[in-house]
């Protein structure tokens, strides 16, 4: 039973990664946020709850500078005509997406194998 819970927890954690990556991709060109300035890339991290030992997913904001593109006609251009774009690199996000997908698939395989073993044990 524990193996089912562990793999389900792993899939749930990877879901958080997928949500963060999706948000980054969706906001890759967002130059204005309610907080002001361009969107900042979010990074999902995994930690462990000391009391329960369970994995926890959280997000942090990537503080690296984004791209500056000269576009004096853009509504968000500064006095010199530059627009600050998010610090999101689509290629990085796509690689992270593939990794998260593979980890999710691995957890799903473990879940299916554990379920199959439990069924066989109940037949005995």
Q: Can you say where each PLM-predicted feature lies in the sequence?
A:
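Amphipathic alpha-helical polymerization modules
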Residues: 1-124
């Amino acid at each position: 039973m524990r193996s089912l819970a562990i793999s389900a927890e792993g899939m749930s954690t990877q879901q958080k990664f997928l949500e963060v990556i999706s948000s980054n991709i969706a906001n890759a060109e967002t130059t204005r946020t309610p907080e002001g300035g361009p969107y900042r890339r979010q990074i999902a991290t995994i930690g462990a709850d000391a009391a329960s030992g369970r994995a926890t997913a959280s997000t942090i904001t990537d503080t690296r500078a984004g791209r500056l593109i000269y576009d004096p006609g853009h509504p968000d251009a500064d006095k010199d005509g530059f627009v600050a774009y998010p610090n999101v690199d689509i290629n990085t996000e796509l690689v992270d997406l593939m990794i998260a997908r593979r980890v999710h698939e691995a957890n799903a395989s473990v879940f299916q194998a554990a379920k199959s073993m439990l069924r066989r044990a109940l037949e005995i």
